[in-house]
């Protein structure tokens, strides 16, 4: 599955010391920290999803899915008690040396399986009912057969290393352009909301896998604080 395009973010840098000298201002010195909060859109490649229980064992191949962005409003995006409702990104970073930061991040996305799509299904269902049987062919994912989503969070918790490279800095230090590149590892902890046949709905948090990620970006700093 592919993710994530960050479309807007707020970033706050904090300095750990102060001195009066002629050296240019830097927001990436050793010991500095930052906090980032933003929102994202996510796009997913096709996935293979396996289901296994006491009386079923099957796989769905090349399943299509989409994200579910929350409609923009002050209530949904800026009220403090609603900040985890939209698809969000949160990150804290600490500069372990100049221009090199170690960060901890939380990416909250949403994953919704496309309903009524046709996929390849292989396996068997032994539960009595209209879907009992062996499968090795096309299957339409109707709502009475399966609904599957991570709308309470397809959550990616990760650590990253980021390298910053200064491109331009104005003489008054009020405008800085920096490139950045980074990579990290993490694990997926979604809350899956799934309903299969007439089984009870499942909606528990669980560790669902691990991931690696990389990024490149451009950072614009408009003020020193």
Report residues per predicted region.
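Short glycine/proline- and aromatic-enriched beta-strand/turn motifs that initiate or cap beta-hairpins
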Residues: 20-94
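Bacterial Sec-dependent N-terminal signal peptides
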Residues: 1-25
């Amino acid at each position: 599955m592919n993710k994530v395009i960050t479309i807007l973010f707020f970033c706050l840098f904090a300095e750990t010391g102060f001195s009066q000298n002629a050296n240019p201002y830097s927001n990436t010195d050793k010991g500095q920290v930052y906090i980032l909060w933003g929102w994202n859109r996510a796009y997913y490649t096709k996935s293979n999803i396996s289901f296994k229980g006491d009386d079923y064992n099957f796989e769905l191949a090349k399943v299509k899915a989409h994200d579910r962005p929350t409609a923009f409003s002050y209530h949904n995006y800026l009220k403090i008690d609603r900040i985890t409702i939209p698809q969000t990104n949160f990150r804290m970073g600490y500069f372990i040396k100049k221009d090199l930061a170690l960060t901890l991040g939380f990416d909250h996305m949403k994953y919704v399986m496309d309903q009524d799509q046709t996929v390849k299904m292989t396996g068997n269902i032994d539960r009595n009912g209209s879907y009992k049987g062996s499968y090795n062919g096309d299957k339409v994912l109707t709502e009475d057969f399966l609904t599957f989503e991570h709308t309470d969070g397809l959550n990616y918790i990760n650590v990253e290393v980021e390298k910053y490279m200064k491109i331009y800095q104005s003489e008054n230090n009020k405008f800085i352009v920096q490139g950045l590149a980074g990579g990290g590892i993490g694990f997926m902890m979604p809350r899956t909301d799934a309903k299969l046949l007439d089984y009870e709905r499942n909606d528990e948090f669980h560790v669902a896998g691990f991931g690696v990620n990389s990024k490149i970006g451009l950072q614009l700093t408009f003020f020193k604080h």
